[in-house]
């Protein structure tokens, strides 16, 4: 029997998006398809409404880390392991970035040709495909942006830097991540929100003229709205905000808080500009859990995690 590691890994790296719609003549409600990306065993996977599809790859280790839907097209992004001698036991392997459009794979390599490349997020706008992650040419990882497979460096390698999230609004490209602290790049121009090496941004969302970034500062889950920080937790327990979604004046954030050495998946919600934060445990402390991605549509909240 094939051993499945769907629960451990597919959801851990998942991204969720609600897509497509069709009218139901009976109740006049929209019905949405939900796509989740991840992997099972050595295979990158895409689930649509819970139905799994194995994404094409070279047969070695591969994962899908993000999913995005634009019109009728479904995009996924991830990594594929490459062994230079053609064997699957080479040491060390290297990784190439991959993305799939409607199941058809495209590959792009790291600039060094041998580094540990990672692809963390995906956004499609105006037919252009944006991916972010990190590459490594020397001692420190370099934050990266790929547009249609063409690599652009966001950092120079002098400091630890990674890119975790990308959002495109009009002609502006926003990337959130880590540059020896919480970092936001707008059109490749860096803004530092903190100088704390134990802090990082993991998600960015743009609504109108407002830019929302979430992550952590040391042990505290934190939201930045237009660069102004707001604590989601008091710092007594280790906590992390991993994803943010804004619908109108409502803000939805997911992540985790550690209690009694167990991670509890969390949802923080703020409804309206003058509303108060509501905190909801999505799991109990019986098993460790992390909420990694959130999407909201028609007042329905979709969360993935592990």
Tell what function each PLM region has.
Residues 1-9:
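Bacterial N-terminal signal peptides that target proteins for export
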Residues 27-306:
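Residue-level hotspots at or immediately adjacent to binding/recognition sites across diverse folds
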Residues 17-20:
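C-terminal motif of bacterial Sec signal peptides marking the signal peptidase cleavage site
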Residues 22-24:
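Bacterial signal peptide processing site
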């Amino acid at each position: 029997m094939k051993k499945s590691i769907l629960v451990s890994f597919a959801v851990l790296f998942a991204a969720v998006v609600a897509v497509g719609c069709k009218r139901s003549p009976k109740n006049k409600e929209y019905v949405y398809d939900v796509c989740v990306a991840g992997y099972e065993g050595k295979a990158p996977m895409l689930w649509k409404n819970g139905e799994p599809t194995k994404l094409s790859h070279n047969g070695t280790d591969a994962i899908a880390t993000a999913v995005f839907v634009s019109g009728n097209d479904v995009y996924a992004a991830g990594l594929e392991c490459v062994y230079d001698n053609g064997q699957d036991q080479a040491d060390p392997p290297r990784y190439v970035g991959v993305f799939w459009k409607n199941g058809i794979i495209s590959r792009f390599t790291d600039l060094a040709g041998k580094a540990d490349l990672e692809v963390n997020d995906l956004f499609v706008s105006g037919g252009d495909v944006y991916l972010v992650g990190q590459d490594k040419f020397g001692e420190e990882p370099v934050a990266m942006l790929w547009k249609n497979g063409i690599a652009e460096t966001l950092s120079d390698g002098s400091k630890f830097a990674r890119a975790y999230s990308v959002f495109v609004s009009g002609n502006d490209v926003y990337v959130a991540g880590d540059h020896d602290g919480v970092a936001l790049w707008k059109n490749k121009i860096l803004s530092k929100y903190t100088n704390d090496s134990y802090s990082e941004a993991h998600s960015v969302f743009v609504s109108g003229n407002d830019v929302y970034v979430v992550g952590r500062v040391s042990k505290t889950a934190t939201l930045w709205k237009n660069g102004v920080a707001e604590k989601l937790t008091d710092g007594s327990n280790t906590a992390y905000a991993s994803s943010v979604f804004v619908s109108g004046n409502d803000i939805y954030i997911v992540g985790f808080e550690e209690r009694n050495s167990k991670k509890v998946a969390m949802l923080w919600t703020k409804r309206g500009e003058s509303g108060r934060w509501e905190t909801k445990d999505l799991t109990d402390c019986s098993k460790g859990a992390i909420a990694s991605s959130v999407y909201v549509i028609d007042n329905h909240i979709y969360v993935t995690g592990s």
